[in-house]
Amino acid sequence: MRAWLVVAGLMALYVGVAAADEAALGIKVHKQSGINYITGGGGDTKQAFEQVRGRYPVHVQITVGGEHVDPGPVRITLRDVKGEAQVEADAGGPLFFINPPSGRWTVEAERNGEKLAKTSDLTGRRYLVIDFDFSKP
């Protein structure tokens, strides 16, 4: 029992330090349905996103016509295996990192009426990189 309390305390400390690190880097951590995610990654925040990418196993990268530019408004939806939306948010830039639990997830992105989606299995310590390349207007 005592060992469990020590482990729980260390985990709480780690989570607090992780959030503090992101805040110190100027990244706001969002949370929906118990899932943490960060948005943006353009301009000055790109370097900060690279520093915390290991904490988020799902990396959504948004391009337009194959170019890494500010994509403008992009709506991201993360759906569970039942098809229920667990996260719905604006990308806020070319990167959208998500920390869902293991399972089958569908990530959808919508920009100017164009919809893209990808379903993947997230297991163990695996990282998923999901590239969404939208058409140029």
Which role fits each region the language model picked out?
Residues 101-102, 124:
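Surface-exposed loops/turns
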Residues 75-86:
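Short amphipathic beta-strand segments in non-cytosolic proteins
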Residues 13-17:
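N-terminal signal peptide c-region/cleavage motif recognized by signal peptidases
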Residues 20-74, 112-137:
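Primarily secretory-pathway and cell-envelope proteins
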Residues 103-109:
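A short tyrosine-centered beta-strand micro-motif
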Residues 86-91, 120-122:
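Short beta-strand segments within Ig-like beta-sandwich modules, predominantly Fibronectin type-III
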Residues 1-6:
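Bacterial N-terminal signal peptides that target proteins for export
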Residues 93-99:
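Short, surface-exposed beta-strand/beta-hairpin micro-motifs centered on an aromatic residue
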